[in-house]
């Protein structure tokens, strides 16, 4: 399991937010954030941290 730092935003937000998510893969981390922010969420920079 790794920690991913991902920029996330939605059309309703006026700025990007950084989220820290522990997951087995980047796809799993993004799908967790889609559940949290909704399907209109989009992602910017992401980085894996051990």
Residue ranges and their predicted role:
Residues 1-17:
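Short aromatic-glycine-(Arg/Gly/Cys) micro-motifs in beta-strand/loop hairpins
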Residues 10-12, 25, 38:
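N-terminal regions of proteins, emphasizing targeting and processing segments when present
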Residues 19-21:
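Generic detection of short hydrophobic beta-strand segments and adjacent strand-loop junctions
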Residues 35-50:
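Short, mixed-charge low-complexity intrinsically disordered segments
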């Amino acid at each position: 399991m790794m920690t991913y730092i991902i920029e996330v935003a939605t059309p309703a937000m006026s700025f990007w937010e950084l989220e820290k998510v522990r997951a087995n893969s980047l796809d799993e981390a993004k799908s967790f954030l889609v559940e949290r922010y909704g399907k209109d969420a989009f992602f910017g920079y992401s980085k894996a941290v051990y």
